[in-house]
Amino acid sequence: MVDASGRAAAEGWRKMEAPPDGAADLVPLDRYDAARAKIAANLQWICAKAYGRDNIPEDLRDPFYVDQYEQEHIKPPVIKLLLSSELYCRVCSLILKGDQVAALQGHQSVIQALSRKGIYVMESDDTPVTESDLSRAPIKMSAHMAMVDALMMAYTVEMISIEKVVASVKRFSTFSASKELPYDLEDAMVFWINKVNLKMREITEKEVKLKQQLLESPAHQKVRYRREHLSARQSPYFPLLEDLMRDGSDGAALLAVIHYYCPEQMKLDDICLKEVTSMADSLYNIRLLREFSNEYLNKCFYLTLEDMLYAPLVLKPNVMVFIAELFWWFENVKPDFVQPRDVQELKDAKTVLHQKSSRPPVPISNATKRSFLGSPAAGTLAELQPPVQLPAEGCHRHYLHPEEPEYLGKGTAAFSPSHPLLPLRQKQQKSIQGEDIPDQRHRSNSLTRVDGQPRGAAIAWPEKKTRPASQPTPFALHHAASCEVDPSSGDSISLARSISKDSLASNIVNLTPQNQPHPTATKSHGKSLLSNVSIEDEEEELVAIVRADVVPQQADPEFPRASPRALGLTANARSPQGQLDTSESKPDSFFLEPLMPAVLKPAKEKQVITKEDERGEGRPRSIVSRRPSEGPQPLVRRKMTGSRDLNRTFTPIPCSEFPMGIDPTETGPLSVETAGEVCGGPLALGGFDPFPQGPSTDGFFLHVGRADEDTEGRLYVSCSKSPNSHDSEPWTLLRQDSDSDVVDIEEAEHDFMGEAHPVVFSRYIGEEESAKLQEDMKVKEHEDKDDASGRSSPCLSTASQMSSVSMASGSVKMTSFAERKLQRLNSCETKSSTSSSQKTTPDASESCPAPLTTWRQKREQSPSQHGKDPASLLASELVQLHMQLEEKRRAIEAQKKKMEALSARQRLKLGKAAFLHVVKKGKAEAAPPLRPEHFAKEYSQHNGEDCGDAVSKTEDFLVKEEQREELLHEPQDVDKESLAFAQQHKAKDPVALHELERNKVISAALLEDTVGEVVDVNECDLSIEKLNETISTLQQAILKISQQQEQLLMKSPTVPVPGSKNNSQDHKVKAPVHFVEPLSPTGVAGHRKAPRLGQGRNSRSGRPAELKVPKDRPQGSSRSKTPTPSVETLPHLRPFPASSHPRTPTDPGLDSALEPSGDPHGKCLFDSYRLHDESNQRTLTLSSSKDANILSEQMSLKEVLDASVKEVGSSSSDVSGKESVPVEEPLRSRASLIEVDLSDLKAPDEDGELVSLDGSADLVSEGDQKPGVGFFFKDEQKAEDELAKKRAAFLLKQQRKAEEARVRKQQLEAEVELKRDEARRKAEEDRVRKEEEKARRELIKQEYLRRKQQQILEEQGLGKPKSKPKKPRPKSVHREESCSDSGTKCSSTPDNLSRTQSGSSLSLASAATTEPESVHSGGTPSQRVESMEALPILSRNPSRSTDRDWETASAASSLASVAEYTGPKLFKEPSSKSNKPIIHNAISHCCLAGKVNEPHKNSILEELEKCDANHYIILFRDAGCQFRALYCYYPDTEEIYKLTGTGPKNITKKMIDKLYKYSSDRKQFNLIPAKTMSVSVDALTIHNHLWQPKRPAVPKKAQTRK
């Protein structure tokens, strides 16, 4: 538990173990009383504020005292002060302005003053605290605690505010306003603390780096590097908070903040900064915090060690006021000792580094390097290798943390990691990139299992605990010459960081051979590409060097023609054991980032760990995608950062299945800017085309489509089929870019679990690069500088390229990737809000496209950089490679577009057939598709012709509203798609892959003659401009539209249409923007326009598919208005069972809102549809091309039906390549599409109904459980006639809504009436019960008086019985008693308890928790605590005469008795409850007390212990209560038998005279005014005549009260 090596820990532990040192005072958690701690902390705070910490009156310093029974109570002076409001007025006067202070005269004035400041005094149950609560005589402590909390909050608000925090943080850090802006004070505190801790991380990282550089020298580099590494291991861990109370309880974060502001007073070495702190460490830190506060901050720490350590939630206001005070001291007061640390301290160091980096490199001979690689013994030194410059070999080192501001000048102005509270500071990105992910405590994304043990990580290290995120982990690429790592395993290159939403550092993608046939073979020759990877971990630091000169054995099928110089890429994975490995290669053979030594972990084959085990180990953020294939698919992405490229340089590496021999001269760094990466987003994958050594069809297209990745939440890696490979399915590389993406990625990860190709996303974190290397890289990779700032990738992803091509050329709604790309292509260069705001702000992410940079453009941007050195040459040639890839990718995208068009055509025909089927049920003859005029006429009869104007008004409103909603909703849905796409592309078997390939060929052939034009990529630029205009227009109209929408709904008249019933769900229009393409004037009337089956987004939240505004298109005269989806359910994918919406065949598909997309200029209305193929749990998402009309004309109905049905049955989910819809997502269609269940085509008799789902008719049989749905457009040339029908449908819908609303209102009224009746009935019952109770009490009283009179007469010889003048019991006890005859039992409420308790006997526990405990004197727990609250008369008048003595009986013996009452018995005490302890107490302390009676008492108690009866009765001689005998009472039989003593053997009902109850706390018996025995009776007397006349010689007359 305790790290003895840590000074703080050891010291703290000593204190805890040695009681004399004071640590024994620590209250264990199980005995820690949070309620008491709250009272103590609040009283200490308010007294300190009222009087000054050093001037608190002596009697107020400790507010508690312990009474004789060792119970803790609040001192009367404190209670008096609280009740008098003096403390509150004093403290409140310190906050208020001068003239307001005079008005503070009492509790109410303080409450009002606080409320004027927006702070309301509320108890924990949200009831407002009133003046009466605060001045109530038995103090109500909960109200006073709420008052003190409100004053603390007022103080907090005075000292800290969100604005102040933001202003403070801006001085030393940067952040994303859209993601990280605090939303309340607590969040602001967490924000401030985290930012300071991140700043400290940066500073310490820079210091470590500076020391490294200064210590290094060519002669002693290795030794010094090693030594520095060892010292760096001790580097402190600066924690980041997620929860203020939970994460801040160890004091480490606050001490780090104090150190930042007061480095001289709080030395960093004095603070115990560990990732996992023990209790001793925490205690040490808290003591340190308290000492600092007492010495420098005016003793503002008002908590105990336990308060801070256990951090109960009730103390949150106290902790917050302390943090606010810290902030106030450091940011407002700023005493002399406050001197914040800053980067300024490192400027001199930076200058030194610059000078050093400008020196010529020190050449190191190949022989020297080989010497380190030659023997394992050299491993220890090899990993100490210094930064080596190898200019001639093109081995570009990358420094992954640019420090200089100019690095960030090009479009990287503000990084915006999606995760909040992560560092976005430009100038410190270098040092915190490794830390901003691990900073989420205990969720470290560092190079450990988070993903660093990717699901196929070459090393499974179950024995290793997760890497502390505290380590400043400089990760570099490491080459393992000893080949300890299995090169063929997917985790040989364990990419140590998943693409996570907060990743700011470079990402690494590695597709490594997952299933090489002979893994050990490559290990033996040590030349496999992946055998270059040595995953090392020396004291939790990583260095990885990629060796590029490895020549795989030609016999190894996995590396058919891999170039000897193919650049390998590895990610850093932590290895489990501390083995060292030689890690240097020849000068031209590795990329080195030698920041810290690393230790080689054993190869995976040495460990008996299955892939499943490894996968199970991965942390939530790790992402590993695998695809089944014959051989592993190679993809290595490497990031090499130029001086300004923010680690955006990629080196593609040919590998295994794709035989690409890339000459070393051609493999250079390719700068691919991925905005998403700058923002912690997607990977950028450099694509490369195979050279003649490999088939031209081979190759990975690993593209970074920035627009795609940022918003879509994933990246496509499409691999084109190579002749020697057996599959060509696209890979889906997922990344997470938002909070909600985590789940998607995790699920996708599970989906890919069993598949073969590992696609490991990672990013270097904490990579430290010497300034010398940085300087070198400036020259070598300068060509990447200008456009490597994180804009859209020049190398589009297959999907994005395809999308943009098809979007530009054919107005086809390909995929939302394409739309998103178009929307981003034109953006400003600054990336600050592109990623961070994607999920939060409606417009920033969508209207902020980044410019599209092609490889050619990129080449032109920095022509002067090419040819200056081999590195530039390599890069320029790789640029050419990428340009070739671009062409190839365009061809593939065109093919995909054709496939989508084919699918759209099939869907069109299928939908048409379904519509025919539906219509035939309404018409006797089997005719061609029913013309829309039929419906138009029918509806016009019902609706009249007068509704057109109103509808046309509504149409414009709704279209605009849809556009607005699209903008609002799209960013939120972006992240939902990654899992969907992953599922969609998860090929179940090779057959599906072949089927996909065959489909591609077929679709290409089919569409070659039907699609009249080739995709023109250049149209993207035009659409981009128009898109931006559209978006800006829509943004301006948002506010107006929201008002117009409501007006629209009110204006629409309703016309009843018989025979139809509409859905009545009342929803707002939240539809995304839909644009419908211009219709071809030559469209055949009998054919509908091909539907665009758009993107069903895999939105777990159930949002509809987001549809983009591709661009404005002029339309011809044939343009007709097309209604968009209904107002009701567009945004909500709500399933409507078919059975719930019976429809007549006369209104199929017309039940839609009439909102033509129609401004006269005509925007293309893109409608999204989801076709849910339930058999595959996939979605076919198809997009229509702009030639869809032609397609629909040329394909016969039969062909379409056959093709569609066949397609639905097959695994053709890859056709659309983008979206999928979860299984449970209801089928939804939009606008003028008809959605028809395919099962109805195959089984027409199954369901004869049409179910209207807002924009269309869905034919669904028994709910949504259908394998497929077809869609088709209605012919737009008949739109005018259909418009009338749709108007009618719209009005019908309005009418139905009104009817539904009316019915709903009636139901609500009925429910309210029922509730009222119930309340009246209960009130009547209560009244009757009270009357009965009153009558019964009166009866009892009369009986009692009568018997008392009779008793006086009978006992004349004995004298009048004394009425035992007992002092009334405290009201608190009084509240808990019960009438023995009442038969009722009600528990006392906390309020009554605290209201009636007197201050002197107030128990702390009962005051703090308002629970009726510990009010019994002597600390004896009450065995029978009940309440008299149900008998208000009896329970509220303790000062009655003797006839009410029984009322004051103690709660300790107040079981309800069952009286001789014939009315309803509310409660019967179970007879199993025993009164043995009470009788024991009575005999010991009352009946036989004293030394004289001790022998007798002992004998009686012995008998009592021997007996196992439940209930006992004491027999008294008479009203004088002289003890005579002890009896056992059996309530079931109501028999009373003598146990011991003097008296009759048994007592019957008739013998009983009086009944008594014993009060344990007052040690006396009280007479009960009842005649009937019950278990609540403790003693009794029998009639006097039953006693023998002989009196005992020495009667023992016990005192009734001791």
Curated annotation (Swiss-Prot):
Subcellular location, record wording: Cytoplasm, Cytoskeleton
Keywords from the UniProt entry: Coiled coil, Cytoplasm, Cytoskeleton, Disease variant, Intellectual disability, Lissencephaly, Microtubule, Phosphoprotein
Region span, Sufficient for interaction with calmodulin: 903-922
Phosphoserine PTM positions: 217, 371, 375, 416, 431, 563, 575, 589, 629, 722, 728, 738, 740, 1080, 1398, 1427
Residue numbers bearing the Phosphotyrosine modification: Y1537
Region of interest (Disordered), ranges: 426-471, 603-637, 772-808, 825-870, 1075-1165, 1206-1226, 1301-1448
GO cellular component, one term: microtubule
Disulfide bonding pattern of the chain: none
Biased composition (Low complexity): 797-808, 830-841, 1206-1220, 1393-1410
Sites bearing Phosphothreonine, chain numbering: T512
Biological role: Key microtubule-organizing protein that specifically binds the minus-end of non-centrosomal microtubules and regulates their dynamics and organization. Specifically recognizes growing microtubule minus-ends and stabilizes microtubules. Acts on free microtubule minus-ends that are not capped by microtubule-nucleating proteins or other factors and protects microtubule minus-ends from depolymerization.
Subunit structure: Interacts with spectrin via SPTBN1; the interaction is direct. Interacts with calmodulin; calcium-dependent it prevents interaction with spectrin.
Protein name, per record: Calmodulin-regulated spectrin-associated protein 1
Highest classification ranks of the organism: Eukaryota, Metazoa, Chordata, Craniata, Vertebrata
Gene: CAMSAP1
